[in-house]
Curated annotation (Swiss-Prot):
Organism: Nostoc sp. (strain PCC 7120 / SAG 25.82 / UTEX 2576)
Listed pathway(s): Amino-acid biosynthesis; L-arginine biosynthesis; N(2)-acetyl-L-ornithine from L-glutamate: step 3/4
Transmembrane segments: none
Lineage, highest ranks first: Bacteria, Bacillati, Cyanobacteriota, Cyanophyceae, Nostocales
Gene Ontology molecular function, alphabetical: N-acetyl-gamma-glutamyl-phosphate reductase activity; NAD binding
Subcellular location: Cytoplasm
UniProt xrefs under SUPFAM superfamilies: Glyceraldehyde-3-phosphate dehydrogenase-like, C-terminal domain, NAD(P)-binding Rossmann-fold domains
Name of protein: N-acetyl-gamma-glutamyl-phosphate reductase 2
């Protein structure tokens, strides 16, 4: 039986390198690569794109659109890791745990968009509550999130790594900073479309002086609701939604052992995995709750999710290579 052929268009980038590393040791697939000198050769790329079973695009948005235009074979499946097609018609959103039946859609699709890192954490927390009517679709959602600097790609990685090398481990000039202050972050449309919310969430991302890891926080002022759910009810609803899932883990409610020194929620604890952990914190007296997702922005937030989606698209056990 022939092994399925996989081509990573953009394998030299941050996500591409991570996916290549995860796939290179596997003996159940055949990786097809392009010579470094021909990475910008449209004819050579088109030849490779149309010769494989699955093409994984790890490219900027415009380059991803160009790559899709080069594919003329209906037998080639495309998994795009850019933001170009995450809200596009004709594309299946590659978050298998998001909805019942999502895996089947991914398995049967020719075109699959790999989710963004921030949206993965956000949707893991909020989608179950909207889908089950625990929160109304009109609920105003705010997201505060922090990612390691690898989320900024090669340029930001080089900036931080260079500073660390020069200063022999000292923190950088920008140990923590928020951005996206024009409220136009490219992930907002994706979050809105796939969450079931009536209005876009207010999203404020940040970058910290650590390489990878991510915390996505959603505060819930439950006192604004006429009959607010308790923190435990919210936790139960999310836990039930993800029952039996391998890569979405709902942490026990009010378990101090999950916190560093009983106080801190560490952004880096699941690095190197394809796991997103969901936490629920609540105070029923003040009618407040906090949802937190913890994930590796390069794992379940990028390359790990891509490998999981690839496995589903090929009809393989989705944990292979993860």
């Amino acid at each position: 039986m022939n092994k399925p052929k996989i081509f990573i268009d953009g394998e030299a980038g941050t996500t591409g390198l991570q996916i290549y590393s995860r796939l290179n040791e596997r003996d159940d697939i055949e990786l097809v690569s392009i010579a470094a000198s021909k990475r910008k050769d449209a004819d050579e790329r088109a030849k490779l794109l149309n010769s494989v079973d699955v093409a994984i695009l790890c490219l900027p948005d415009d380059a991803a659109r160009e790559a899709v235009s080069l594919v003329n074979s209906s037998q080639v499946k495309i998994l795009d890791a850019s933001t170009a097609y995450r809200t596009a018609q004709g594309w299946v959103y590659g978050f298998p745990e998001m909805n019942p039946g999502q895996r089947e859609k991914i398995a049967n699709a020719q075109f699959v968009s790999n989710p963004g890192c921030y949206p993965t954490g956000f949707l893991a927390c909020v989608r179950p509550l909207i889908a089950q009517g625990i929160l109304p679709s009109s609920f105003p959602i705010t997201i505060n999130a922090v990612s390691g600097y690898s989320g900024g790609g090669k340029s930001l990685i080089q900036k931080y790594d260079s500073f660390h090398e020069q200063q022999k481990g000292a923190t950088s000039d920008y140990p923590f900073g928020i951005y996206g202050l024009q409220f136009g972050h490219k992930h907002v449309k994706e979050m809105h479309q796939h969450s079931g919310l009536a209005s876009p969430p207010l999203f404020i991302p940040a970058v910290g002086d650590f390489e990878q890891g991510m915390l996505v926080q959603i505060p819930l002022p439950l006192w604004t609701l006429d009959n607010p759910p308790s923190g435990e009810e919210i936790h139960q609803a999310i836990a039930q939604y993800y029952q039996g899932e391998k890569f979405v883990q709902v942490a026990p409610f009010k378990d101090p052992s999950l916190l560093r020194d009983g106080t801190f929620l560490d952004a880096t604890a699941v690095n190197g995995t394809n796991i997103v952990q969901v936490f629920v914190f609540g105070n029923d007296n003040t009618k407040e709750a906090l949802l937190v997702a913890r994930l590796d922005n390069l794992g379940k937030g990028a390359s790990g999710a891509a490998v999981q989606n690839l496995n589903i698209m090929l009809g393989l056990p989705e944990e292979l290579g993860l």
